[in-house]
């Protein structure tokens, strides 16, 4: 079950992939997931996608400063540029502070 994320900063990355270089994309995505998890303030990630290459990835950070530091990380910036050049047809990003967080689970 999900943790309470009230007060955390959420970065919502909504994208559509080109379908180009799927292996390179998978390698880069795994590397970025691992690198993000090592960053100060990282709190977790959720990801959903469909067969058409559209996806939503939400990364959670302790605060906006942590999210900004991740955006500025040199390896992340390099991979972001590769994504613009090869892997994404488009993307949009939203940053928000979570005002309320709860979950439910069937038992």
For each feature predicted by the language model, list its residue ranges.
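A common structural junction motif
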Residues: 77-80
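Short S/T/G/P-rich N-terminal loop/turn motif that feeds into the first structured element of a domain
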Residues: 1-55, 64-72, 88-107
